[in-house]
Amino acid sequence: SIEEFFEAMYIKHISKVEEYGKRCRILSELYRRLAASVTAEPGKITAFFSQFTPKEPKFFPLLKQLSEVLCEASVVLIESLQHDSPTERSDYYKKIKDLEREGDRLTHLIFDELGTTFITPFDREDIHDLASCMDDVIDGINSCAKRISIYNPRPISENGKELSRLIQEEAIYICKAMDELETFRKKPTLLREYCSKLHEIENQADDVYEFFITKLFEEEKDCIELIKIKEIMHELEKTTDAAEHVGKILKNLIVKYA
């Protein structure tokens, strides 16, 4: 009947009101206890809420430090190519290996911070990828130095030295880009310019590598030496590719946030 229908609707409505009232009372009690805890132990409650506040400052210095390690490794690589003795090459490799380990330490520290920070300045994946790619460039430099030390080839040609100089140029632009990370949302012009430079340098590196490989197969008659030089040059070229990939990640940041 109509009376039964309205009675059922009334009971249903009342039950919802009672449920809402119950929730309000629970929230009210929670707020009361929270206010009491703030008064009694302000340090504890501040520490709790600090987990949910942005921790932007700590990521920027860490990324900057990682880029500085990259720059230093690129300088040592250039220096290493000026020396031909096995002992000197081994010494330079050890220096670069130490820098590679420092790069690994900073990269893992960034990953650890990502795991404990609730709010990050960019998406976690972007920070993770940026740190990983810079670490890849350092790994590439280390791989070049290792092969030079182990293979002990004839003096590196001017093309090889040119590739190492291009790697250093890319490292410098990556360092500059890290300086812009904190403010690029408002002024993305410089960061965009550095990304373009990284792309241009990588194209130059491709040209240098292709020209050298063509000449190598035309002129080198010693098969063992050919294999040594080709592999070292390939590692140098791969390292320029890794540096350009840093630029691609930075371009994505500009698209997403600027």
Where are these regions (language model features)?
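Cytosolic, long alpha-helical scaffolding segments
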Residues: S1-A258
